[in-house]
Amino acid sequence: MRRILLIPFIVHTALASAQDTIPLNDLSFWKPNEVQNWKIVADVTADLEEDDAMKPTKGTGVVANLPTTKNRNNLISVAEYGDVEVSFDFMMARNSNSGFYLQGRYEVQLFDSWGQQHPAFSDCAGIYARRRWNPDAELFDGHAPRLNACLAPGLWQHLEIAFQAPRFDATGKKIANARLLKVVLNGATVHENLELTGPTGGPISEQEATKGPFMIQGDHGPVAFRNFHIVDKSGEPVNVGKFTYKVINGNFRYPEDFANKKADKTGTTDQLTWEVAGKNDGFANIFNGSFTAPKTGNHHIVLQAAGKSSLLIDGKEILGDQWTYVADQRSADITLSKGPHTIEIVNYKMDGWMSPFLGLWIAAPGAGPTALHSMGSVLALEASDPITLDAAKPTVFRSFMDVTLPNSVRGDKNFLNIKNPNSKRVVHAVQEGDPTRLHYTYDLDNGAVVQLWKGDFLNTSPMWDNRGDGSSRPRGAILPLDDIQTVVTKDRLFDLTTAQNDPVHGFKPLGYDLDEMGYPTFRYTLSGTEIADKIRVSAGKTLNRSLTFTNGAQNSAAQVVRLAVGKKIEKSGDNLWTVDDKRYFIQTTGGAKPVLESTGGISVLFLPANSNVEWTILW
């Protein structure tokens, strides 16, 4: 049976559109507040052990809510927004509670939900419920996040929201509900195309409107924000005219193969669609049309086509002739003057195994993307449903894993040079899934934990669908680490290459053993020393590592254990350290005193190797 699938896409234009960055040098972006619970500070820290404990440092760049019994007002923006994209970093104190309101009416919950296994609408990034008629009435219509991507209190987290305001007719009657087009917490999509039937609990008004201010709750507990970026999407979109088209039948490799051929079919169409060809492959479609830019400024173009395609505006090549897979998007930014512009789109395809697809979006300054294609043109045939693997019990899964490495030095043969220069395919990777929904990838070639993630376990479609490529993908919020040896000789403390580049000391993986519960302990040798790397997850919050050195332990005297590598590592408490601007915590046990050394912009936190070294990653 063939299934028709609308390939999922959301055209992101925020990074390419004009952004407003809220300058947190003062509180001028926000309405004057009679009480003083909101402060401009340089940074904050939150205690992992004490509820509602947050301490500021003097300076600018962060806005923090530090409520007292008397001072606990909300923060409301001066500016009002309709359709908008907004992103920011935030930090929660332990067991603290806040909320970010779109238009002062629709709350995205902010809460210390660290380790919560089954999140509700009241957990972090949940959409808070509505109340019937009065503040004391029952709750209804709340929306829990798809997964719990919340980090530990005291760490900076990141939230991205794409919001579409409700629509009203000329009489003021609501004709379309507000929508959250997408909500992303710490890199994990937690809501998508979510309809909001009305204001959630605690709004500035139950009456909906075309525009409204941002509001941040300040009456519950300490919370801090920084790096606010706003893209107002309420502007006028481009106006698109009709298209003429030519269809040339045949299998073509290059534009010159059909440049001088007579068209087999011509016509006009209101919207772009590959369907004018009348078949799925063996065609070249050439479209010519026009659109009107509502004002002068940057326009963001996104083209998604199966096969080869190109795009010209006013006769200038914007996207050159290039082959792309059906799900791949290409984009460009171009400054256009107000008024009419010509456009030409070429799409030719001879790949019978791939479904046809043609989509084009243009976002004018301050407006969302306008689709120039028909809905039928962005439907594709998909052979199978996603193949996923869950971890109802401790689960070990072997596959390739593509990872992003923040600090590793390029040069390893497995680095990928395509889209992300710091991405790498780990070929001897072990994926360990835990029922508490904190999982990790271990590289047997380096004795390294290269990433952690929160949420569901694996998407194995890349491995098992059709021919596959042997890889799997995490399903959740990811903490990238580095694919470098955990244990090295002291002279290699700042060597961020892999064990393959250290043949002298003889790193040799020995595989892993499983205990009675199914948890692995990894084993390898280095300079004649046998090392057992026991890794256990606790409560979905922490990853605990214990290294035991045996046989040839005299050689371990010259070795060190790298607990963390980063650009910025700071001590934040007894046996507690933060890495890379509070991205995650490192905690040592047993009275061990880690050493911190830095050079060339890289810091390493390490302990001398002895019979046993233990530490914990809190994230």
Residue map of PLM features:
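Bacterial Sec-dependent N-terminal signal peptides
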Residues: 1-19
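Carbohydrate-interacting regions of secretory-pathway proteins
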Residues: 19-260, 266-274, 279-288, 292, ...
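Beta-strand-rich N-terminal accessory domains
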Residues: 20, 78, 379-544, 555-583, ...
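Short, well-ordered beta-strand segments enriched in hydrophobic/aromatic residues
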Residues: 86, 90, 543-551
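Short, hydrophobic/aromatic-enriched beta-strand segments in well-ordered soluble domains
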Residues: 90, 160-163, 344-348, 522-526, ...
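Short strand-turn-strand beta-turns centered on an Asx-Gly dipeptide
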Residues: 176, 184-188, 192, 304, ...
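Acidic/polar, compositionally biased interaction segments
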Residues: 194, 234-393
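Solvent-exposed beta-strand/loop surfaces of large extracellular or lumenal domains
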Residues: 194-204, 271, 313-332, 570-605
